[in-house]
Amino acid sequence: MHPRVLAGFLFFSWTACWSLPLPSDGDSEDLSEEDFQFAESYLKSYYYPQNPAGILKKTAASSVIDRLREMQSFFGLEVTGRLDDNTLDIMKKPRCGVPDVGEYNVFPRTLKWSKMNLTYRIVNYTPDLTHSEVEKAFRKAFKVWSDVTPLNFTRIHNGTADIMISFGTKEHGDFYPFDGPSGLLAHAFPPGPNYGGDAHFDDDETWTSSSKGYNLFLVAAHEFGHSLGLDHSKDPGALMFPIYTYTGKSHFMLPDDDVQGIQSLYGPGDEDPYSKHPKTPDKCDPSLSLDAITSLRGETLIFKDRFFWRLHPQQVEAELFLTKSFGPELPNRIDAAYEHPSHDLIFIFRGRKFWALSGYDILEDYPKKISELGFPKHVKKISAALHFEDSGKTLFFSENQVWSYDDTNHVMDKDYPRLIEEVFPGIGDKVDAVYQKNGYIYFFNGPIQFEYSIWSNRIVRVMTTNSLLWC
């Protein structure tokens, strides 16, 4: 990620707007006129350069397709220049109000603070949390950045601080209005005088310290990144990615992309509690290994660490998402997954628990324990799973064994477990992930995948794991 000039304090003048002929995907017949108007507004807000007076540059009107392409590229979508369901879904996700483009040539250089000791002041509070909860969230959010830089943050209670923090609704005094519940959550301004560094939070949102509503700590940590001079990142695993995703209750660790960005401005600190920071996986890494694979309504989901790639059958470029985008109830990292097409369900496993999802929605009464499937107590995790729709059987792989589950009678088959090498000779004694396609089973073991013929019961081809992602 590169720290660039931000547009947080460039004001919008909607009197200068015009109609943009937004192209659509011919297959997306369910898109409404309201959807197209929303998409136009989104692109104007986040992908059109403005001049210092806040007026949209008229040269941008002829480049609507380019802006749509830029937005699709930024979020790792298939770049078509046409509005489709996937693009619209991304546009409708809750996000930061700072634009994603860096074409704001009104500043001579990248902005950063010229000092390491900064002050902040909480001007007012949200009624959603106690004062102490709000103060704790902001204190933690600043610590995210001070842990990896020489920066120090001190709270003051009166006067003007470097970073003034406030809650407001709709038009709240900076000519950059909020939009009510969801949508735009907050915005912040880059280092500088007046509004410079200030962070504003939409009080029409429900702010929480949990997975419900919007977690104030996570949003604040992101906004304070802007207050320090960081732009949005294209890395979906970065804190500075513009879309909000709840990342879990466990201790937050600043991703490597954000560390590199902030240290390029202020240098490293000497009190970083972590020797390593989480990195987003590279799909073309020759040593790539996988955690799980499953199909979902014709698409393929490929899980690695706290992410999954979404691979469309007619596309080469895979889209990368956080696993938590399924929902905050899911774990950050999973062990196994499989689809049950006739029930329109996928099952996701982590440790001794599993979840059932219909599409991207988690079913009630989950998670359940894997012991309910018939696994004995000594089985601590499922490493891979594969469902056969025609026979109603599901194979579960755990350590060096494979189990066969009868989905019709909801019992384990009597002749199992068996050794993996005995049932599928040649693939090794463990399976990281597995899926089937066109009469072949694909077993993944570290950086290697085996193409196994169901008809001849033998390996017919050995490939690299990353070839699944067209590398």
UniProtKB/Swiss-Prot annotation:
Ranges spanned by the short sequence motif Cysteine switch, renumbered to the chain: 94-101
Enzyme class: hydrolase
One GO BP annotation of this record: extracellular matrix organization
Segments annotated as Hemopexin repeats: 281-330, 331-377, 379-427, 428-471
One CC-aspect GO term: extracellular space
Disulfide bonding pattern of the chain: C284-C471
InterPro entries reported in the protein's UniProt record: Hemopexin-like_dom, Hemopexin-like_dom_sf, Hemopexin-like_repeat, M10A_MMP, MetalloPept_cat_dom_sf, Pept_M10_metallopeptidase, Pept_M10A, Pept_M10A_Zn_BS
Propeptide feature ranges: 20-103
Sites carrying sugar chains: N117, N152, N158
Location of region: Interaction with collagen: 268-471
Region (Interaction with TIMP2): 176-246
Entry function: Plays a role in the degradation of extracellular matrix proteins including fibrillar collagen, fibronectin, TNC and ACAN. Cleaves triple helical collagens, including type I, type II and type III collagen, but has the highest activity with soluble type II collagen. Can also degrade collagen type IV, type XIV and type X. May also function by activating or degrading key regulatory proteins, such as TGFB1 and CCN2. Plays a role in wound healing, tissue remodeling, cartilage degradation, bone development, bone mineralization and ossification.
Protein name, entry field: Collagenase 3
Organism: Bos taurus
Gene designation: MMP13
